[in-house]
Design a protein with these regions (language model features):
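Alpha-helical recognition/docking segments in bacterial nutrient-uptake
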Residues: 1-80, 143-144
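Hydrophobic alpha-helical segments within soluble ligand-binding/sensing domains
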Residues: 67-92, 107, 111, 132-141, ...
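Short beta-strand elements in bilobed, periplasmic/extracellular small-molecule ligand-binding domains
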Residues: 1-7, 110-133
Length: 228
């Protein structure tokens, strides 16, 4: 039996996992995210429970099975694309660096700027922990400045939709006043008008590989941790 565990926060997810473990309802777990100081990953690791992480891991990489795409390279290539389109003031909007995929995409964005002789500016980066954070003032200040960015790289499609809606409130036209590039090529990227330009990070293949590795390690428990 396959079970999907969701929760409002780490505590809810951890509680559900602990309940499943107590009732011997799972042979392994797949975490669809990776972040610093994650209590869920720490619990699974400390209890010696089989788990596979989708994303680059923050702790105990040599003892952890994980599947990752190169988010830094994806961030760099996305920023390169905006540079090649003629943009020289490129900003970044993303979730907290605690989420490692966002930290890596931001790092790639900064690498691209440096490669093109542009010094990354921290004031051009707006980051949030959740959508409940007070990010609107920071975005408004950035996007209405006289020398405002002409393009913005966004860590994922959901935030890009939020940004596009916020630009509408400010009277900014996409892409005439601000070009946006995001990541994931999810359903969210196709419900906006205009549709988002988004980088496909192959989530289906990542999920398939994570499931394959989980089954492989269940059937062969003495296998060493795999990094893909």
């Amino acid at each position: 039996m396959n079970t999907v565990i969701t929760g409002q926060d780490d505590a809810e997810v951890l509680d559900a996992i602990q309940s499943m473990v107590a009732n011997a309802q799972a042979d392994g777990f797949i975490l669809l995210y990776s972040k610093k100081d994650c209590p869920v990953a720490a619990y699974l690791r400390n209890e010696g429970l089989l788990h596979v992480i989708v994303g680059k891991v923050a702790q105990s990489a040599n003892q952890t099975i994980y599947i990752d795409n190169d988010n830094a390279l994806a961030g760099e290539e996305a920023a390169d694309y905006l540079y090649e389109m003629g943009h020289r003031r490129i900003a970044y909007f993303g979730v907290s660096n605690a989420m490692l995929f966002s930290a890596e995409r931001k790092r790639g964005y900064q690498m691209s700027l440096l490669k093109h002789g542009i010094t990354p500016r921290e004031e051009d980066c707006v980051e949030v922990n959740t959508l409940n954070d007070a990010y609107e003032e920071a975005l408004k200040s950035l996007l209405t400045a006289p020398d405002h960015p002409t393009a913005m790289l966004v860590s994922d499609d959901i935030l890009a939709v939020v940004l596009e809606q916020f630009c509408g409130k400010l009277g900014l036209r996409i892409p005439k006043d601000l070009s946006i590039v995001s990541f994931n090529n999810s359903l969210f990227s196709r419900i906006t008008s205009p549709q988002l330009t988004t980088v496909d990070v192959n989530p289906y293949q990542l999920g398939m590989e994570a499931a394959s590795q989980t089954i492989n390690h269940i059937e062969n428990p003495n296998l060493l941790a795999t990094k893909i």
